[in-house]
């Protein structure tokens, strides 16, 4: 499922899932990823940049051993797709409340030593982000119009609050990561994974 414009999926699918719908506030950091403001006063993210970043991040993640990637989501609507993404690519996940010390305190049962952290929202996932910074881990993050990019090494501009957007982004990322490993094709993944199953049911 790709698009004649060169996008990974048709533009309409991004728009129907609200991937480009930002917030009414924007951070100075996110200005370069914003296209315009809609009639409701919401900043709209540039979908060409989102699409391009998905390609870049899929390639970047494949530089790491899958088991050394940790995907986190404290945000409710991100928990199911984040977990499914981690399972699909062979990574670890920590969804729901992130236990303080999980990246810094070896005495904890939840302690992990990943090589890279992937956050669903730098604001909601602040605890894990802080610990990753303290341990020198590279950080990839889904970033909305209001997010700050401080401590996020590779940003993926997208609506990180909607269950539809989060499901699509994580589904698409898993597809691209696996395609680069020659582990799937567009058609095979579409047949094996119903996008609806990736959506949070909260």
Segments (PLM) and residue ranges:
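Ribosome large-subunit tunnel/peptidyl-transferase-proximal elements
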Residues: 2-192, 196-199
